[in-house]
Amino acid sequence: MKRTFQPSNLVRKRRHGFRSRMATPTGRAILKKRRTKGRHKLSA
């Protein structure tokens, strides 16, 4: 059986990267929450 996690840096950046987060209102809300919490790393 094939494993579910097949790592790819390109897909990782496209799906969870900073620019993709900024592209939607919900994504911006996520970044805002993470800034408020004081996360060192905001996105992938």
From Swiss-Prot:
Compositional bias of kind Basic residues: 30-44
One Pfam family from the record: Ribosomal_L34
NCBIfam families referenced in this protein's UniProt entry, alphabetically: rpmH_bact
Keyword Cytoplasm: no
Name of the protein: Large ribosomal subunit protein bL34
Alphabetical list of InterPro entries matching this protein: Ribosomal_bL34, Ribosomal_bL34_CS
One GO term (biological process): translation
Disulfide links within the chain: none
Family recorded in the similarity comment: Belongs to the bacterial ribosomal protein bL34 family.
Entry GO CC: ribonucleoprotein complex; ribosome
Single annotated GO MF: structural constituent of ribosome
Region of interest called Disordered, as start-end residue ranges on this chain: 1-44
Keywords annotated in UniProt: Ribonucleoprotein, Ribosomal protein
